[in-house]
From Swiss-Prot:
Entry-linked Pfam families: Interfer-bind, Tissue_fac
Native organism: Homo sapiens
Residues bearing glycans: N56, N166, N171, N192, N209
Lineage, opening ranks: Eukaryota, Metazoa, Chordata, Craniata, Vertebrata
Family: Belongs to the type II cytokine receptor family.
Keyword set, alphabetical order: Disulfide bond, Glycoprotein, Receptor, Repeat, Secreted, Signal
The protein, known as: Interleukin-22 receptor subunit alpha-2
Disulfide bonds: C110-C118, C238-C259
GO terms for cellular component: cytosol; extracellular region; extracellular space; plasma membrane
Length: 263
């Protein structure tokens, strides 16, 4: 017969081994590289499977929360130390009643999803406020711990697309019309909201003389209509543009080249 102290030691060892094994399993299920990817305020939460997961053997659960660094004095007052960022009447704005919200909320469309991403654009539309997202995985009846994103503030972190260009030839010159990217919000009259409503933007226009293989910046400013003059007849030119955000010292990628022949 096994002595009592040996049997007790066996039970303790068995229990600790089981706990360690369970913790190891949970850790290996935990989603990796959980982060927001944002373009033009389309805010997508993305992640990678845990080390133990392959294929479609698991499902994921997504939560999010907004973190305001202020507190409400009363339900009728603006939070102390806070300020209203934007005065507008389209769905991208939130009322002051939203200030102070800190609870994790389920994203119903991504609750039990097999995808590795979740669109949180609508849930993160207070663009100057910080957010967090988190994801947990489940497989074969086991659940991982939550894996959380770094702090995400859309206004600071979204990347904007290059401008859309329309080019028209006018008496040997080129008239370039630039359009800033639209956002996923709309005004009440169904008018698209532009990135210009949120940032000071400068447009940069470059022209390339194909015969000389030489690029020249011909414009930098806030106007969206740019005329390029003094072009050489019977020559080929290409035009590209980008957007620069002075406050963030950040620029977009360049647009696709648009090429024309000057008669």
């Amino acid at each position: 017969m096994m002595p009592k102290h040996c049997f007790l030691g066996f039970l303790i060892s068995f229990f600790l081994t089981g706990v360690a094994g369970t913790q190891s399993t949970h850790e290996s299920l935990k989603p990796q590289r959980v982060q927001f990817q944002s373009r033009n305020f389309h805010n997508i939460l993305q992640w990678q499977p845990g080390r133990a997961l392959t294929g479609n053997s698991s499902v994921y659960f997504v939560q999010y929360k907004i973190m305001f660094s202020c507190s409400m004095k009363s339900s009728h007052q603006k939070p102390s130390g806070c300020w209203q960022h934007i005065s507008c009447n389209f769905p991208g704005c939130r009322t002051l009643a939203k200030y102070g919200q800190r609870q994790w909320k389920n994203k119903e469309d991504c609750w039990g999803t097999q995808e590795l991403s979740c669109d949180l654009t609508s849930e993160t539309s207070d663009i100057q406020e910080p957010y967090y997202g988190r994801v947990r995985a489940a497989s074969a009846g086991s659940y991982s711990e939550w894996s959380m994103t770094p702090r995400f503030t859309p206004w600071w972190e979204t990347k904007i697309d290059p401008p859309v260009m329309n080019i028209t030839q006018v008496n040997g010159s080129l008239l370039v019309i630039l359009h800033a990217p639209n956002l996923p919000y709309r005004y009440q009259k169904e008018k698209n909201v532009s990135i210009e409503d949120y940032y000071e933007l400068l447009y940069r226009v470059f022209i390339i003389n194909n015969s000389l293989e030489k690029e020249q910046k011909v414009y930098e400013g806030a106007h969206r209509a740019v005329e390029i003059e003094a072009l050489t007849p019977h020559s080929s030119y290409c035009v590209v543009a980008e957007i620069y955000q002075p406050m963030l010292d950040r620029r977009s990628q360049r647009s696709e080249e648009r090429c024309v022949e000057i008669p």
